[in-house]
Every structure is written in C-alpha cells, then in structure tokens.
Design a protein with these regions (language model features):
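Short alpha-helix in the alpha/beta-hydrolase fold that links the catalytic acid
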Residues: 49, 192, 206-215
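Short beta-strand/loop motif that positions the catalytic acidic residue
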Residues: 190, 196-198, 202
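Catalytic histidine-centered segment of alpha/beta-hydrolase-like enzymes
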Residues: 230-244
Length: 269
C-alpha cells in the first residue's frame, strides 16, 4: 500500500483488530472475496463475515480505508479517492492469486465496490445497506457545514469504541456525497452479477434509495432483498436478527456465480 494511504506516526492504528486482514481458504479454493467496511468503521467490522466465508472455501481479504482505524482527525483530512484507491489495490492483489474475485461491502464500502465495478469486472457484487441518499436531511449540505461544525457526535456501546469513531467528521460525509455523485453516474455501466440487501430498520440511510440504486444497476443477473423493521443498518453484525438468513443469501449467491464461472453445479449452503 502506498505510504500516503497507510497509517502515519501522527495517526497510528489504535487497535490491532482494526488492521486489514487476509485469510486463505479453509477448503479447496473457490475464489476470493474482497471485504470493504463502512464509514467510521474498520476491518474489524468484516471479521465475522470473513470467518464464515473462509470456512466456506473462499479466500478473504479486508482492506482498511484510509483514515479509518486511526482517529477521527485522520479521517477528516481524507478524500474518497483515497478510499477507492485502497479498494482497487486490494482487488488487484487478490486477482494475482485467484481465478475470480467477488466484492462484499457494507454501506460506504458497498458504494466503493460499485465504483470499482464500473472500472473492473469482479465475479459478483454483494452490496449490504447501500444507498443513494443519507437519511439526515442536512447530509447534502455537508460541503458547507464542514466549515461550521467539524464533527457530529454519536453514542456508541462501550465495547464498540475501539473499532468505530464516536465523532463523525462532517468533511467525511461531504466525501460520501462526492462519491455518491460518481456512483449515480456509473451504476448503468456495472455489469457484474449483484446481490443488494437493505433493511427497513436502517436509521442511517434512506432505504428507498437503496432500491433505487438496485434499479439503476446495469448488473445482469441481479437480486434485491429487503429485511423488515427489526433489522438495522449494520448488516455485517451477527447481532442482527436476520444473520442466519443473510449468511444463506450470501453463500447461495457466491456458490451460484462461482458455479456459473467454472461450469460446476452450485452446492447448497
């Protein structure tokens, strides 16, 4: 990873669990899955999914988006192009050792994978909690608000404080808005098979815009799944009541498109 994308002496990684990770397949290799975490999170967020995918026969690698896993001050100075570059480099690294690479991302991580897929041709995309609009009505104005208020404070459960930021940089939300403008333009160009998942209980993003994203996707085939109000934004968490069903959806999608690529019959999760 280039020096400008990595941690620095000023902003070191504050917890080893926030480091990027790469795990080989526990069974004969069925391909690889690139995992991309969300805004103000860290690779730790993707570990539960990563372990399940590894045990199912997939090599997995999770990137750390620049400015994440260090400090909110570090994130404040970052641009979405740096995040996207980290995703591109992770994808290209997996490509060198695997016959096919899937992408699985949550929230902003899902948007970054969509931007990647407009340039590359992954074997498939799994987009968890994607969106074209954030829920907060002031989110579109963050380009100006960043000069008035630097951070938005939120409440975190104590056990999550090492892995997520309590303070969200408003400048970072502005970067998400910039990324959204790009993704909106590029969605029709994406052709990789896609699974898109949202939940009615999501209080972070505009859920209807997730469906709109799905409809604009040029992917063929593509599938959309909407969970109910009991399920929230953090679909990568085993604490979600939909977790067993979500794992089944993900594995079925991967195995089907893995079989499509190789000519083998898809196995049942």
């Amino acid at each position: 990873m280039p020096e400008n994308l990595g941690p620095t002496a000023e902003f070191p990684i504050r917890n080893e669990a926030n480091q990027p990770f790469s795990w080989p397949a526990a069974q004969p290799d069925q391909g690889a899955v690139l995992l991309v975490h969300g805004f103000t999170a860290s690779p730790w967020e993707m570990r539960p999914l990563g372990r399940i995918l590894q045990q199912a026969g997939y090599a997995v690698a999770a990137v750390r988006l620049p400015g994440h896993g260090t400090s909110h001050e570090d994130l404040r100075r970052r641009h979405y192009e740096e995040w996207l570059q980290a995703v591109i480099e992770g994808y290209e690294l997996l490509q060198t050792g695997h016959r096919q690479v899937f992408g699985l991302g949550i929230s902003t991580g899902a948007l970054l994978l969509a931007a990647l897929a407009a340039q590359q041709q992954p074997a498939g995309l799994i987009l968890l909690s994607p969106f074209l609009r954030l829920r907060h009505w002031l989110a579109p104005a963050c380009g100006l608000l960043q000069y008035v208020q630097a951070y938005q404070e939120r409440t975190l459960r104590p056990e999550l404080i090492p892995y997520y930021y309590r303070y969200r940089p408003v400048a970072g939300v502005h970067q998400i808005n910039r990324l959204l403008r790009r993704v909106r333009r590029e969605l029709p160009q994406i052709t990789a098979p896609a699974l898109v998942v949202n939940a009615l209980g999501d209080r972070t993003v505009n859920v209807a815009s997730g469906r709109h994203l799905f409809e604009r996707l040029g992917s063929r085939p593509k599938a959309y799944h909407l969970y109910g109000p009991e399920v929230g934004h953090g679909l990568a968490s085993p604490d979600q009541p939909c977790w067993p069903d979500l794992i089944s959806l993900v594995l079925t999608f991967l195995r089907h498109h893995d079989a499509t690529e190789t000519g083998r019959s898809p196995s049942v999760p």
